Amino acid sequence: MGPKRRQLTFREKSRIIQEVEENPDLRKGEIARRFNIPPSTLSTILKNKRAILASERKYGVASTCRKTNKLSPYDKLEGLLIAWFQQIRAAGLPVKGIILKEKALRIAEELGMDDFTASNGWLDRFRRRHGVVSCSGVARARARNAAPRTPAAPASPAAVPSEGSGGSTTGWRAREEQPPSVAEGYASQDVFSATETSLWYDFLPDQAAGLCGGDGRPRQATQRLSVLLCANADGSEKLPPLVAGKSAKPRAGQAGLPCDYTANSKGGVTTQALAKYLKALDTRMAAESRRVLLLAGRLAAQSLDTSGLRHVQLAFFPPGTVHPLERGVVQQVKGHYRQAMLLKAMAALEGQDPSGLQLGLTEALHFVAAAWQAVEPSDIAACFREAGFGGGPNATITTSLKSEGEEEEEEEEEEEEEEGEGEEEEEEGEEEEEEGGEGEELGEEEEVEEEGDVDSDEEEEEDEESSSEGLEAEDWAQGVVEAGGSFGAYGAQEEAQCPTLHFLEGGEDSDSDSEEEDDEEEDDEDEDDDDDEEDGDEVPVPSFGEAMAYFAMVKRYLTSFPIDDRVQSHILHLEHDLVHVTRKNHARQAGVRGLGHQS
């Protein structure tokens, strides 16, 4: 059995050609065995020698991984991107994968490529096509970050003050299955939620996924910030972030900062910093003559003194509860922060300024404040609604908080109900199929009963049944008028032939046939018995107007969903084909019937 076939790179093919030229007396079969390739492959390589050497010179370093001359669908974009990448690397500056993707998106926007998304798959193929490889140090850092992490255990119930422990603090014990509805009676603009998150301010989120030039160094504790975010339920008020870190206060001083900053040895929000923050909030609410509720999560509340709070009531989430701001708001803030870092890094790379790649504490605080302001109030209100609170102006909270376990139980109950409904629908569908089968058998032996002879009970069942996607039979009947577009026009042209639309069941005939057609069928039965037998075997075919009206409803249903241009184009092509085929078949059917009557 010969060697297994494999696709060689241009660099490997070039080495084979070089080996043949350096050893002219060596048999070709021996060279093929030396490189573990079939003799036919060697012959093909030597035949295309000139093209292979030209491709190796063209791709340079990329020839070590490039195997074909097949161009990427974004060849022009990649050409500009690799030229930019080589220019930056020649200056000795590192280019990370996320920066490369952001630059590709900018180039695509300039070229008008709206379908380009700079996905991770494209980035991987781009690297292989152009020989951009990952460094070993970066790969090790990626492996560390990809390792599964054990989720942190929830805070001990003992750390949460119990109800009635003094001050304006309200606590919930872990043993309580249903937490009290402390937010009930408050307007949505008077219900605030605060949560604390960590931010590695001098690193991109995918630091380990950089390209050659990244050092993959471990993160330092001094580069981590703790950020406290606080907003109300309708998103109309976003309090300035409280940021804590290990580094001393910036030289600009607290007055020149866009948010409050505090430094301590642990780098977290301490009890003293939180008490000062709440005192300032209480003073502000007193000036506005408001009483608000603040729902807190992972805060330093073990020894928090709230006796001086008069206009702020503090309550704590029970263990295992997903806080409103952690349902997407925190992720948005980090995303906006990353975008600001990307813009700064790209400006430094294009200006070939290595010092611009470093981010100072003062600039990081400005980025945090800008990222917080970039969050839309509607997104904050949506997260509160998802957490079980009302959202929107002047809304009153009437629902209680739900833990993760309770939400999972509710989702399981809903899934069980949906499964039960699905089983009932399947049973009903099987019964309808059996009834339809019986109707077909009866249709072969005798005429189908008229609609007026149907029992009243069956009529009620048919009225109650709806189509598979919630479309009633009456909606289908109105398709000629309501669907719009070209199908509506075609259906209107045949409205006289199909005044009312009905579904065709089993062996039922179409009720839209006119009385003249019934008279013609009776005349055919009297004139020719053979024609009667043939007509009895014919499957009822909807008229042209009926077909157009049916598809008009299908089109209206499909276009009721958000669809892209490609799907819209498919629907338009299908419309054109259906009109053409239906007209052709309708004309052919009319001609066949005319010939039958003449005979």
From Swiss-Prot:
Sorted alphabetically, the keyword list is: ADP-ribosylation, Centromere, Chromosome, DNA-binding, Isopeptide bond, Methylation, Nucleus, Phosphoprotein, Ubl conjugation
Q: Which residues does UniProt assign to DNA binding?
A: 28-48, 97-129
Q: Which gene encodes it?
A: CENPB
Q: Crosslinked positions for Glycyl lysine isopeptide (Lys-Gly) (interchain with G-Cter in SUMO2)?
A: K246
Full protein name:
Major centromere autoantigen B
Q: Which Pfam families match?
A: CENP-B_dimeris, CENP-B_N, DDE_1, HTH_Tnp_Tc5
Residues carrying Phosphoserine = S156, S165
Record-linked InterPro entries: CenpB_C (IPR015115), CenT-Element_Derived (IPR050863), DDE_SF_endonuclease_dom (IPR004875), Dimerisation_CENP-B_sf (IPR034882), Homeodomain-like_sf (IPR009057), HTH_CenpB_DNA-bd_dom (IPR006600), HTH_Psq (IPR007889)
Q: Where is the HTH psq-type domain?
A: 2-52
Compartment annotation: Nucleus; Chromosome, Centromere
Could you name the Gene Ontology cellular component terms for this entry?
Answer: chromosome; chromosome, centromeric region; condensed chromosome, centromeric region; nuclear body; nucleoplasm; nucleus; pericentric heterochromatin
State the protein's purpose: Interacts with centromeric heterochromatin in chromosomes and binds to a specific 17 bp subset of alphoid satellite DNA, called the CENP-B box. May organize arrays of centromere satellite DNA into a higher-order structure which then directs centromere formation and kinetochore assembly in mammalian chromosomes.
Homodimerization: region residues = 536-599
Write down the species. Answer: Homo sapiens (Human)
Q: How is it modified after translation?
A: Poly-ADP-ribosylated by PARP1.
Could you tell me which residues carry Phosphothreonine? T396, T398
Comp. bias intervals (Acidic residues): 405-475, 506-538
Q: Low complexity: which segments have biased composition?
A: 144-159
